[in-house]
């Protein structure tokens, strides 16, 4: 059987620690890889100038029966074009506390389950799930001209 490289789920980062808790949570502590330059969130250009960093805790998709949490430093970089901005992380939307993988999982679940059940299943707040579902509907349906709507049927 082959070894699974769990760090490959989070490109640009290395897993430096893992902690299991009794309440079915797993915490992975990540560290930026030295061979990856941070990129500006606005222009996506690599920049070696790091202003500071903050530790952020984000939610990842469940692994079997365990809730997965990631703890990672998010750096603010001094981009020569854009000024001081947070770095761009491919798998973590800007300012989000949920990874893209977790958001996609929630989007899939809300198509089949009520929001309340998705909230209980994932441990994510009802309002957060509702916002993710609104964004999904906006991208899939687009804007609707309500002036031409005559009836709403449920």
Task: Locate predicted features.
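Short, conserved DNA-binding cores of transcription-related domains
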Residues: 1-81, 88
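Short, positively charged, Gly/Tyr-enriched micro-motifs
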Residues: 44-47, 57-154
């Amino acid at each position: 059987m082959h070894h699974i490289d769990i760090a490959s789920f989070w490109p640009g980062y290395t897993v430096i620690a893992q902690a299991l808790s009794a309440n079915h949570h797993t915490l992975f502590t990540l560290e930026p890889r030295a061979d990856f330059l941070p990129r500006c969130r606005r222009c996506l250009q690599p920049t070696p100038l790091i202003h500071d960093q903050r530790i952020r805790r984000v939610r990842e998709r469940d692994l079997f029966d365990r809730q997965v949490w990631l703890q990672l430093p998010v750096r603010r970089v001094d981009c020569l074009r854009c000024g001081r901005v947070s770095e761009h992380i491919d798998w973590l939307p800007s300012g989000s506390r949920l990874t893209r993988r977790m958001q996609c999982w929630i989007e899939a679940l809300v198509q089949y389950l009520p929001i309340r059940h998705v909230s209980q299943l994932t441990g994510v707040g009802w309002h957060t799930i509702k916002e993710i579902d609104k964004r999904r509907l906006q991208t899939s349906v687009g804007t609707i001209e309500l002036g031409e709507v005559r009836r709403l049927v449920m």
